[in-house]
Amino acid sequence: MSLMDVLRQQDPDLAQAIDSEAERQRHGIELIASENYVSSAVLAAQGSVLTNKYAEGYPRKRYYGGCEFVDVAEDLAIKRAKQLFGAEHVNVQPHSGAQANMAVQLATLEHGDRVLGMSLAHGGHLTHGHPLNFSGKSYEIHGYGVDRETEQIDYEEVAEIAHKTQPKMIICGASAYPRNINFDLLRTIADNVGAILMADIAHIAGLVAAGLHPSPIGVAQYVTTTTHKTLRGPRGGMIMCSAEHGKNIDKTVFPGVQGGPLMHVIAAKAVAFGEALQPEYRDYMRRVVENAKVLAEALTNEGLRIVSGGTDNHLLLVDLTPVNATGKDAEKALDHAGITVNKNAIPFDPKPPMTASGLRFGTPAATTRGFGPNEMRQIAVWVGQIVRELGNKSLQAKIAGEVRELCAAFPVPGQPEYV
């Protein structure tokens, strides 16, 4: 009897929700840029007996007994992350990317310090200074963005704002930016004003690990990331820095912002890092980028405008203004057709965020499933048809059937029960 069989017997209501989600994943196309499918091995580690163990502290420096085996799991995660990214010091305990960012900020800043981060409206992240987030409430935030014409980061503007505001920290990285980030130039800008540079690579960590995006390791003083998204691990966070900053980071994570680490999640992180160290992982990331470029070109052929004119990484932003559609309406219509994306503001968007003029697409999950350029072109055709006729329910139903047929040829990894 499988664990899911046990759950179906004991808690059928919850089991039904999980079974329904598995079915949704199996029969639909996942194009949310921050999502991916983990392997059976990652699922096995995260669902293991390590979930029973409390382990406050760090390997061989715990506040509880009986930690000799969870120490092995954390040591493996740290060792593999160091090897994967070339970092001197790694903390794998943050429960999320947001908590990793919080820990770095608390370790280096005082309340009210000035911080320069990429505006959320231009592709940044909540934890980079949004007024509703802890970062925006704790520090004096100044924002930078993209050039109105190129829709790429305006590094001259970043330098000008930094010179004017004299921030203690500059944060780079993004949640909806399709171009490479020049970490070396940002470090120069930071050095010129005496600022710390923190790089949040949550979205592009897999590309960095595979050598397909410039690495901020050894450039930024602090690098944070999530462990899911392009890394295909469990949902969690991680901090990388030089050895000299390691002790301060560790004591800020614990006991500063967290108590007991999630040892089952850390074990799953170790599994994912081990998978990312394999030669086939780089090929996977290469195909992710190729698929994103093909999808961008194919959507352009459907009459849609791609923000910044294309993509260098795993995601792209589509401006729906040429087809008189909103991101909110397009997301809903595509969802009815079995294609999952998210509405997203575009730079200088006149519409409110919950309506938005754009859609964000990402190729990591579909590529994990085995989709290639031909499937990307077919997806673009479906997207074009749907956004031009948002109210056409029969068209959405027809495409949903075609999507289901396509997905049947590409089983979802990590779901042997449901294949």
Swiss-Prot record:
It comes from Herpetosiphon aurantiacus (strain ATCC 23779 / DSM 785 / 114-95). Its main location: cytoplasm. Pfam families: SHMT (PF00464). Homodimer. It comes from the Bacteria. GO terms for molecular function: glycine hydroxymethyltransferase activity; pyridoxal phosphate binding. GO terms for biological process: glycine biosynthetic process from serine; tetrahydrofolate interconversion. InterPro entries: PyrdxlP-dep_Trfase, PyrdxlP-dep_Trfase_major, PyrdxlP-dep_Trfase_small, Ser_HO-MeTrfase, Ser_HO-MeTrfase-like, Ser_HO-MeTrfase_PLP_BS, SHMT-like_dom. This is Serine hydroxymethyltransferase. HAMAP family: SHMT (MF_00051). Catalyzes the reversible interconversion of serine and glycine with tetrahydrofolate (THF) serving as the one-carbon carrier. This reaction serves as the major source of one-carbon groups required for the biosynthesis of purines, thymidylate, methionine, and other important biomolecules. Also exhibits THF-independent aldolase activity toward beta-hydroxyamino acids, producing glycine and aldehydes, via a retro-aldol mechanism. Belongs to the SHMT family. NCBIfam families: PRK00011.1. It is an enzyme of class 2 (transferase). The record marks H228 as: Plays an important role in substrate specificity. Keywords: Amino-acid biosynthesis, Cytoplasm, One-carbon metabolism, Pyridoxal phosphate, Transferase. Its EC number is 2.1.2.1. The keyword Transferase applies. The modification N6-(pyridoxal phosphate)lysine is found at K229. It catalyses: (6R)-5,10-methylene-5,6,7,8-tetrahydrofolate + glycine + H2O = (6S)-5,6,7,8-tetrahydrofolate + L-serine. Its cofactor is pyridoxal 5'-phosphate. It is found in: Cytoplasm. One of its GO terms (cellular component) is cytosol. (6S)-5,6,7,8-tetrahydrofolate binds at L120, G124, H125, L126. Pathway: One-carbon metabolism; tetrahydrofolate interconversion; Amino-acid biosynthesis; glycine biosynthesis; glycine from L-serine: step 1/1.
